[in-house]
Amino acid sequence: MKSVQFCFLFCCWRAICCRSCELTNITITVEKEECGFCISINTTWCAGYCYTRDLVYRDPARPNIQKTCTFKELVYETVKVPGCAHHADSLYTYPVATECHCSKCDSDSTDCTVRGLGPSYCSFREIKE
């Protein structure tokens, strides 16, 4: 009986404490090579946990797909990068997530690597706005 109560309490704790896949505010650094500057902007992206499991053995009937928290819907916004030369295109377009879900990572539109450059990577000096 105690093990049943423990399992019930553990499941309740997990449901309350562990955040599911949801929209979250993040700051990313954007840069344009022609401009030589970086700026930090606030945007919305997906973060959280998705239920997944690894099979101990390979089963051809059931492929092993790791689910990740990723966007379901997104829109694009544009910002002007200051300090660009007059002949350079100073507009930078970036994605903003509007809806999230747990799904297989789509490497055509998402960086699915374990360790990418990160949202604050900048090759140039940063302009504080």
From Swiss-Prot:
Any Pfam family hit: Cys_knot
InterPro entries, per the entry: Cystine-knot_cytokine, Glyco_hormone_CN, Gonadotropin_bsu, Gonadotropin_bsu_CS
Alphabetized UniProt keyword annotations: Disulfide bond, Glycoprotein, Hormone, Secreted, Signal
Database matches in CDD domains: GHB_like
This protein's record includes keyword Iron: no
Protein family according to the UniProt entry: Belongs to the glycoprotein hormones subunit beta family.
Protein name: Follitropin subunit beta
Species: Bos taurus (Bovine)
Phylogenetic lineage: Eukaryota, Metazoa, Chordata, Craniata, Vertebrata
Gene that specifies this protein: FSHB
